[in-house]
């Protein structure tokens, strides 16, 4: 297998960042990829919350738009048709300040909107509709 210099090939259990230390590892990365064909998972907001420029698979099939991320503002949307183009754009201009701005805005959005406090508030509001 050909290894690329800008990709970390270390498995999670082969370094000190395991279990609850994993977010500290994510914070060391400039970018990350989250892809799930059928439904978004915790990696979507976990990576964004760590401040990574997050390439997210958001499609009609996985219904990921409900998370509230905005393509080009809080993350980069990818799908099976555009991911190579999106990665190439980033890798060919990796020092462009727009990537850091998107990562920072994505982190702020995630910490503000996808947290336990907000989830409990939303759940209480939903429950009061049915009581």
Locate predicted features.
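Short helix-loop-beta junction
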Residues: 1-8
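Catalytic binding pocket for nucleotide-activated donors in carbohydrate/polymer assembly enzymes
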Residues: 10-16, 20-131
């Amino acid at each position: 297998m050909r290894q690329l210099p800008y990709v970390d090939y270390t498995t999670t259990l082969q370094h000190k960042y395991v279990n609850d230390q994993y977010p500290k590892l994510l914070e060391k990365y400039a970018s990350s990829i989250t892809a799930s064909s059928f439904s978004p998972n915790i990696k979507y907001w976990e990576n964004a919350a760590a401040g990574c420029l997050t390439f997210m698979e958001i499609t009609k099939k996985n219904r990921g738009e409900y998370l509230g991320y905005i393509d080009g503002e809080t993350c980069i949307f990818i799908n099976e048709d555009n991911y190579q183009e999106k990665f190439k754009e980033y890798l060919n201009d990796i020092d462009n300040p727009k990537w850091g701005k998107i990562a920072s805005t994505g982190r702020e959005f995630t910490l503000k909107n996808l947290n336990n406090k907000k989830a409990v508030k939303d759940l209480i509001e939903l429950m009061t509709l049915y009581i």
